[in-house]
């Protein structure tokens, strides 16, 4: 804990260890599940992954009358009422893209989906671009810096989300936004993750690019990866989640992404 991994070490086409801030750990098995920074570790072993990150904003209201115990998404709003009566909400899946030079990676694969849903993205040129340039010039340790980015929410979403909530549920006329927070979502061009043991280098397994659905998929993916590492074969066919789909032309463009 608190020790960053900077590289996956290989020899003779096989994993032999991971390089960390505190030295090298020898191992013949590595699961790369480093979220939005997985592409950096994989790049070091010759696997090019067109992975990006977008910044989402969520909000929480004051305590309100009961609406529903279910998660609701529609009419440009997603909501979930908590047991204490407050409501978590987000505005129509709109996300911010903090532009950096890294966004050139996989651009041709992302572009069709971006253009077809461009109203859901807000392109931002801000301090993230400067930090990216400085890191590239100074040779900063990209996989572990910043260690805890704490992305800021886009508070411009709050009044829109609140107005939609009151329009959908007129009984919630006293609703107010009391908290907002931001988070990074790692994304891949087709909206589905990479869950793979590519074979080169041997001993490597990958689980990344969950596009905001990792919390729900975590238990089954963890079980399948454990099977893969233990027996060499998962109990389900995971061929659709291969990392090579982005380079061998088998990636299927999605009609929509949620």
Roles of regions detected by a PLM:
Residues 190-258:
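C-terminal lid/capping helical subdomain adjacent to the catalytic/cofactor pocket in oxidative enzymes
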Residues 8-133, 144-155, 159-168, 172-173, ...:
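Flavin-dependent oxidoreductases
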Residues 57, 65, 182, 242-248:
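Acidic, glycine-rich active-site loops and adjacent beta-strand->loop/helix elements
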Residues 25, 186, 216-217:
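Substrate-binding strand-loop-helix patch
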Residues 137-143:
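Short, basic/glycine-rich phosphate-binding loops at helix/coil junctions
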Residues 1-5:
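A conserved beta-strand/loop element that lines the FAD pocket in flavoprotein oxidoreductases
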Residues 12, 17, 30, 80, ...:
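Short, flexible coil/turn micro-motifs enriched in small/turn-prone residues
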Residues 153, 157-212, 248-251:
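A glycine-rich dinucleotide-binding beta-alpha-beta segment and adjacent secondary-structure elements
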């Amino acid at each position: 804990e608190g020790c960053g991994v900077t590289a996956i070490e290989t020899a003779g086409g096989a994993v032999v260890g991971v390089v960390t801030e505190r030295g090298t750990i020898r191992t013949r098995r590595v699961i790369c599940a480093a979220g939005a920074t997985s592409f950096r570790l994989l790049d070091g072993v010759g696997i090019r992954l067109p992975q990006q990150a977008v910044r989402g904003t969520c909000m929480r209201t004051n305590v309100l009358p009961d609406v529903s115990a279910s998660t609701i998404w529609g009419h440009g709003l997603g909501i979930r009422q908590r047991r204490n009566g407050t409501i978590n909400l987000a505005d129509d899946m709109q996300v911010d893209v903090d532009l950096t030079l890294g966004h050139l990676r996989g651009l041709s694969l992302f572009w069709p989906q971006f253009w077809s849903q461009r109203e859901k993205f807000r392109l931002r040129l801000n301090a993230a671009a400067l930090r990216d340039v400085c890191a590239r010039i100074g040779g900063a340790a990209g996989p572990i810096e910043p260690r805890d980015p704490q992305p800021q929410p886009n508070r411009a979403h709050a009044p829109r989300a609140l107005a939609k909530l009151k329009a959908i549920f007129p009984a919630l006329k006293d609703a107010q936004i009391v908290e907002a927070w931001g988070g990074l979502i790692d994304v891949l061009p087709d909206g589905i993750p990479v869950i793979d043991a590519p074979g080169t280098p041997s001993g490597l397994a990958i689980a990344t690019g969950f596009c905001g659905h990792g919390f729900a998929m975590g238990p089954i993916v963890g079980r399948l990866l454990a099977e893969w590492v233990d027996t060499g074969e998962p109990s389900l066919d995971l061929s659709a989640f291969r990392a090579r789909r982005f380079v061998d032309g088998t990636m299927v463009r999605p009609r929509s992404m949620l």
